[in-house]
Amino acid sequence: MQIKLQQVFPNFLEENKISQSGIWKKEIVFNPQELVEIVAPSGSGKTSLVHFLYGLRNDYSGQILYDEKAINQFNAEDFSTYRQSYLSVVFQDLRLFGDQTVRQNLEIKRLLQPYHHHSPIEMMAARLGIQNKLDKPCKTCSYGEQQRIAIIRSLLQPFEFLLLDEPFSHLDENNRKKAMQLIEEEAAMRKAAILLADLKPIEYFNADKKIFL
């Protein structure tokens, strides 16, 4: 899968922020297996970019293409199917089900969009230090624990592009490194690309390309 941005910019963003950007109003191509770091200060449209790429919002000008097809040319059913097969995401606001247990949040994703033949939930939870939280309601977990839950959830489905919006903002350095290693391993297994957007560079992300939004 390849993603192209053709002169894309948010309709609400100030012109000076657009003109200084390495993405807005540019011709940008994200290629298969590419590891891309997007460094984006507050107010530059980082979360909007993730939402645009995932097809959640359309308040922008220009075109976003999946494999040469503009996403606004997909009908709703085809777009949903395509996204389930090729895109996974960790949103900045996580979007977990607070009243459900951690395990239930993860099993829903694994069963609805299966990728692994055997459940890796226990293994991934152990690697990220939340194995003792699996049977507790998500809302009782700290925000840092919830970020790790959202990361694991994103890795349980098929994807060729993984979109990450400030995925480590509430993690200490040790847990950031563990999470990044797991993410890179899962992406490599799928020969998938990673687009990681954050406020500042992540030194332990082995990016092929760095773009300043």
Task: Report the location of each language-model feature.
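Catalytic Walker B motif of ABC-type/P-loop ATPase nucleotide-binding domains
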Residues: L162-E166
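Conserved ABC ATPase "signature" region
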Residues: H118-K133
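Conserved ABC ATPase signature
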Residues: P137-E145
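Helix-to-loop junction immediately C-terminal to a conserved catalytic motif
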Residues: Y54
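ABC ATPase NBD coupling module
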Residues: I71-S88
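Q-loop/switch helix immediately C-terminal to the Walker
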Residues: D93, D99-L112
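Conserved ABC transporter NBD signature motif
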Residues: G62-Q73
